[in-house]
């Protein structure tokens, strides 16, 4: 009953928004920045935004989404809320009931973020802009939101403005709410975080909103967000702010109070189901700090649940956006980066394919997972596999991505949206991967996509969807290798660097067509394969790898160039990796091949070339597999070059040389010897790549050159 009322209001709002929409649209960029996470919602509800808008008639969607919108609108300023809401929520709000389940999170998160963002500017125009803005925002959000990977920053930025705008309202929790919520919304919104964190805001906002009857009344109607917003526009900033939080955060509570309590509850449950924990945290009326803690705490935790659902979506976005916020999640997630990327990676990779539309999403999710989330994307690229799988999920999607460690992991890895995922994808080096990378909504995804030379790799990297996350995820794929990549690797860089040591490396991989030469070139970039392998591997690649890996790793690389190094590297990689690598050395090679996504496919495609490539792909595919399995796939042979190539995986993947390298790597003895060395190098090359990514940024210019290299090579 209230829903229709609200629906009508949103419709009305939509009309005003129509004209306000341009104005509202301008805000979306800022909002989008913070709404990066919102994009995951868009990803989550890619069609839903339109459907939701069209679905305005659907009371359920209107209820929940509006509820969420209502929650947030008051919290954010009338303008912010209206803007954000109109932007993200009004169209959705009206149709949000339908969208509530799906769009509730998406819209909620997006609206939350967007509201926070838009709350800055359009206090007055917010009403009109609300519907329009929300719709455009929805439409715009994907690109815009996706683009800004600094969702946490943006969210914070936006949050602050929102808070500032809300200034009179409850800057205390207006901002935290906006910050946390925006962050939460940015992250959890996609995951459960939004609800859980917004509930923190909700507790605050709800309290305020409860106090703010106009807001509450508005919030009462599912579609009441327009009412609420309209009422809120008249309402004091405080009401609005509280309402924004209340509406946004209190879809469940505020709505519980309101007639649309069911809507609120539905949303709360939808969100609370997804964001139940987060909402509990947030809704516990924790102040922004609690919510901040909640959001961070629940980033991991909530991400676990919702995230598994939405891991990819929110994670991609949140990863980038919540990079800083997720820093701890990145660490938590991927040990630091690996975790984040792993989490983001696995689900994101899986979903990254699906949700690739949010480049930022994976970024947001990956980064959302941790400040290092971008690091998770980038740095956690190697981690992203592991943690991407582990905690890939940024709030919703990301959480789903990363945390959703499951077959979705492959998808999640793809879902692991992160620029670095693209990198990983580039690393994955395959049209599929590239496609996944593309889906992996992230520039870096494209990079990874480039890297995703092969479908397998692409798939793996799709899994490793956020380049870092995907990479992490890929790496995480094989817990050891991925973990090593995650732990060791500067996720994206490293892996990209490792893989995409540089076009040169790749070239050398290509040059390294010769088994010995190629392997050494892969390792060394120089015909002097052994010397270069030692030199490049030890001094150059190893140094890079080790460097990236760590001074110790480098040392280990150099020292461990011998089986010792390999052992150390393997050790460094992890027992699993070591085991895998060692196993790879022996029957493990075939086992690793099997382990590889397509053991035969990758190992067996053209064992020399297709297999190598496929192995490289496999390597990409299961970054772990890719590094370990792919490399292990060519356990002895490919293992070394694979390992060498895992670091060069991008190169390899980028170039058939990698395949040749792999082929060459087929030489079990030589490669095997180096395999652990090199592959650990690969894992450590992640670290090395981290360093090398840093040191070799010019070399690979992680994002750009790697993208270029990956893309070029992919192309």
From Swiss-Prot:
Coiled coil: none annotated. Residues 1-715 are annotated as: Disordered. Residues 32-59, 92-104, 213-224, 257-272, 657-666, 682-715 have a biased composition (Polar residues). Residues 1-13, 60-79, 273-285, 667-681 have a biased composition (Low complexity). Residues 80-90, 112-136, 286-320, 522-536 have a biased composition (Basic residues). Signal peptide: none annotated. Residues 359-388, 397-521, 539-595, 611-628 have a biased composition (Basic and acidic residues). This is Serine/arginine repetitive matrix protein 5.
